[in-house]
């Protein structure tokens, strides 16, 4: 059963080949049998999920119409609210916080009869690219348990890679869907800013955050977006970008002009560079034309991103003070000490580092030097993308400079920040991008290529990703690191 895509599972439900209860129980069995080695989940919603599965089976038995996601098990990153379920953001600060309402994406998924399996691990408050900054436990890469799955949506990518669920929700602030998708050999889609509601997402960087799906195939990205994309009155930043459905758009003619910022590829590991050019060759064989585009301003993207993201994080996380929200220290002599001790005990080192950086760049003495100049460079970066899209339909770039790194290779914070060089610009410019598996490194680890489009061109970007997937014949990669995960046992 794990070999079926989300679409195939839904077809099996519609054709009465499988019950929703049987599907749900099967995936819980996989999680309970193997997740101890991987650590993708923080909590499970088993009783709730089986109850919903039973109700959907009853609807089927009565001949009632069923939703777009009927019978599809879905994992949810633990910064997205599900009513009555803990939302911890993988932080001691929110260890006991129970969500009082559903996020819009969760509400729309359940309206379409999707089954929510549980909450997935992440870097604390979505700050990180290794899922080693979770306060509770690390998540391991199913391809090599000594390597990181990427982050911050590492639990989401690992869960899909291990086939614990065919769809998982992640959030992408600077590459947090695309990078772990590439590291774990799955598809990851970062929608345009405003394409998917952020209502019920715990904010990290409010002008950068976007919820999106991770899946095994591009068709399931389209299915998920059809279920939950679109305007939401509870999120004033959302817009109605799309005509028709994502699923229908996959069959349309693929754009022919693909831009590549060749001057921006020098930092790639050699086999990653070879793989990227092989991916371009696939698109050329199918009739696309590759042209050079000038995106030299991207060299400023990482510092600008960490100025803007840290400033927004410091502002958003100010509410977690032990009074309004979050952990409160057991003892303090005065209010100031209570604030300080509660935040020191509640936040991990990486979150603390970014809050300090954010407060520094927003300080009266430094705001003009850092934050305002950073926003000016952000505007230049947006202009550079717009100029590039006047010459091409889509931009292709690598997702990462290397395959997934080992634990012992986790570098100092600044070096880790620099690894975001191929992903953060997309968020700064509000653009959509899809990461699609593009093959394996010399060490047998998955690699990914990303296709980037203009804001609102999400359907076109999924279409390009689907075309690459079909013509590269790189589809449904199965990791080998966990014994019994794909050989033997129930199927």
Swiss-Prot record:
EC nos: 6.3.5.7
Pfam families: Amidase
Keywords from the UniProt entry: ATP-binding, Ligase, Nucleotide-binding, Protein biosynthesis
Reaction(s) this enzyme catalyzes, per UniProt: L-glutamyl-tRNA(Gln) + L-glutamine + ATP + H2O = L-glutaminyl-tRNA(Gln) + L-glutamate + ADP + phosphate + H(+)
InterPro entries from the UniProt entry: Amidase, Amidase_CS, Amidase_dom, AS_sf, GatA
Any Gene Ontology CC annotation: glutamyl-tRNA(Gln) amidotransferase complex
Catalytic residues (UniProt): 77, 152, 176
EC main group: ligase
One of the protein's GO biological processes: translation
Record's keyword annotation contains Nucleotide-binding: yes
Coiled-coil ranges from the UniProt annotation: none
Top-rank taxon: Bacteria
Keyword Glycoprotein: no
Oligomeric and partner information: Heterotrimer of A, B and C subunits.
Chain's role: Allows the formation of correctly charged Gln-tRNA(Gln) through the transamidation of misacylated Glu-tRNA(Gln) in organisms which lack glutaminyl-tRNA synthetase. The reaction takes place in the presence of glutamine and ATP through an activated gamma-phospho-Glu-tRNA(Gln).
Family of the protein in this entry: Belongs to the amidase family. GatA subfamily.
NCBIfam families to which the protein is assigned, alphabetical: gatA
Protein name: Glutamyl-tRNA(Gln) amidotransferase subunit A
Organism (species): Chlamydia trachomatis serovar L2 (strain ATCC VR-902B / DSM 19102 / 434/Bu)
